[in-house]
Curated annotation (Swiss-Prot):
Its main location: cytoplasm. This is Inosine triphosphate pyrophosphatase. Its cofactor is Mg(2+); Mn(2+). Belongs to the HAM1 NTPase family. It comes from Nematostella vectensis (Starlet sea anemone). Homodimer. GO terms for cellular component: cytoplasm.
Length: 203
């Protein structure tokens, strides 16, 4: 029996590869990507994720997941947070590191939220979260995956960018959120999401 398709809304093929690798062969859905334009919402991470997922479900007309990622500097009260995409685009990893020049507190946390919709208007949007603590450092490693070069997770001497993919996926914010999503789907004989509870994996 062929697996049902689950659309991951992204135009980033690196993200798709990482998501597929983390979910693994046991995941009961076939994950495919589609690059669609979604509005840029403002607000708290959960609100942003839920609204993006609702719009995506309407456009896809079927099961869909969307991801929202935050990089939060403790010295800045959690900013850039959900707006990290725009900071990264303007400043790059080096600029993100320079933002904390003069601040003693270099600690930060990476937060990932995956939102799932069955595509049915009456079904709730489910949120799966993962959080990894770390610090902002001078960029090291390849520059092909966002702000990975300047985030060093607690307990490690390497940045995300310097890590082997299997190591990063095991401890990253995205890995934790996807593990929660995977556990949820594997706990269901059929993905009838209405009665299920979401998990939150935090480090």
């Amino acid at each position: 029996m062929s697996r049902k398709s689950l659309v991951f809304v992204t135009g980033n093929q690196n993200k798709l590869k990482e998501v597929v690798a983390i979910l693994g062969d046991a995941f009961p859905w076939k994950v495919e990507s589609k690059d669609i334009d979604l509005p840029e919402f403002q607000g708290e991470p959960d609100e942003i994720s839920e609204e993006k997922c609702k719009i995506a479900a309407i456009k896809i007309a079927g099961p869909v997941i969307v991801e929202d990622t935050c990089l939060c500097f403790n010295a800045f009260g959690g900013l850039p947070g959900p707006y990290i995409k725009w900071f990264l685009k303007k400043l790059g990893p080096e600029g993100l590191h320079r933002m904390l020049t003069g601040w003693e507190d270099k600690t930060a946390y990476a937060l990932c939220t995956f939102a799932y919709s069955s595509g049915k208007p009456d079904d709730p949007v489910l949120l799966f979260r993962g959080k990894t603590m770390g610090q902002i450092v001078e960029p090291r490693g390849p520059r092909n995956f966002g702000w990975d070069p300047c985030f060093q997770p607690d307990g490690f001497h390497q940045t995300y960018a310097e890590m082997a993919s299997e190591v990063k996926n095991g401890i990253s914010h995205r890995g934790k959120a996807l593990q929660a999503l995977k556990d949820h789907f594997l706990s269901l004989s059929e993905p009838d999401i209405k009665k299920a509870k979401c998990d939150e994996h935090e480090r």
